[in-house]
Design a protein with these regions (language model features):
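RNase H-like (RuvC/DEDD) metal-dependent nuclease/polynucleotide-processing core
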Residues: 1-4, 8-142
């Protein structure tokens, strides 16, 4: 089972990091890209079961933070690993989040109840800073 990671820039001018690992977590390849087409080219010929995206996928709140951002910030702010507020009034979320457009374009699911696989890949929104704090027992984000 391959896993793809996308450190998605919120706009298409900034650099986006992409990586692909095998079922054991070994890095198969990585790249720095800018456009959604380059992301598609990077993933072409591969079948990741899970796509971990460091960017908002589902944003429905008009202002402020999403509930998940509030919860995560409450728990990880003291480690300097809180989140930035995401809402539909932000220009970068118009007409919809870039990550959502990618998910829709590639036909990735977002329902965590599904069993991911090469034929039914699932995209997940991830927070690397808080993950590093939790996984490595850090006192502060790196």
């Amino acid at each position: 089972m391959q896993v793809a990671g996308i450190d998605l820039a919120w706009g298409s001018r900034a650099r986006t990091g992409v990586a692909l690992t095998d079922e054991h977590g070994a890095l198969l390849r990585s790249a720095s890209v800018t456009t959604d087409e380059q992301i598609a080219d990077f993933l072409s010929g591969n079948s990741p079961a899970v796509i971990a995206i460091d960017a908002p996928i589902i944003v429905t709140n008009a202002s402020g933070m999403r509930e998940c951002e509030r919860d995560l910030s409450r728990d990880f702010r003291r480690f300097h690993a809180g989140t930035h507020p995401t809402n539909v009034s932000r220009p970068s979320m118009q007409p919809e989040p870039r990550a959502k457009r990618l998910v829709q374009a590639h036909g990735w699911g977002t329902d965590v109840e599904l069993s991911p696989g090469p034929m039914s890949p699932v995209a997940l929104e991830v927070y690397p800073h808080s993950s590093m704090v939790g996984l490595f027992g850090l006192d502060r984000v790196i």
